Amino acid sequence: INGDAKGIVFFEQETSEAPVKVTGEVLGLAKGLHGFHVHEFGDNTNGCMSSGPHYNPRNKEHGAPTDENRHLGDLGNIQAAGDSPTAVSITDSKITLFGADSIIGRTVVVHADA
């Protein structure tokens, strides 16, 4: 995507045991599926190169959002129409906004061509 995409995404979690609701929209995506992931570092000064790998504090394998064995940062794909904002609407029970495994302060990366 080369940094051409931009948008706003909200993460909401009522309690530490509740799922996280991810909502928002991304502009500038080409038509098709795009990976949507939380990366390890909150540094995006050099695009996704400085954000590190997918957030994976438990050393799991890369997987789909519904897989038991997956990186915490693996949130699946978003579908872009190519000519309008791309809606983000994800509910995830593995990521958290609380405690040692919190995603707060990390970078969200949208990958081209998932």
Swiss-Prot record:
Cytoplasm among the record's keywords?
Answer: yes
Q: Which residues bind Cu cation?
A: 37, 39, 54, 111
- PANTHER family documented for this protein: SUPEROXIDE DISMUTASE CU-ZN -RELATED
Give the record's subunit note.
Answer: Homodimer.
Q: Which cofactor does it need?
A: Cu cation; Zn(2+)
EC number(s) given by UniProt: 1.15.1.1
- Quickly give the catalysed reaction: 2 superoxide + 2 H(+) = H2O2 + O2
| Region called Disordered, residue ranges | 49-73
At which positions is Zn(2+) bound?
54, 62, 71, 74
Q: What is the protein named? A: Superoxide dismutase [Cu-Zn]
Its Gene Ontology cellular component terms are:
cytoplasm
In the record, the note on similarity to other proteins reads:
Belongs to the Cu-Zn superoxide dismutase family.
Q: Do the record's keywords include Cytoplasm?
A: yes
